[in-house]
Swiss-Prot record:
This is Egg-releasing peptide. It comes from the Eukaryota. It comes from Aplysia californica.
Amino acid sequence: ISIVSLFKAITDMLLTEQIYANYFSTPRLRFYPI
């Protein structure tokens, strides 16, 4: 595995984690939990 592909995988994982964190911290889901 190359360094570039490894770096891209880590970046994608961090971006996905950030998107989920932003999604689950929205007031809509806090006030109306599923």
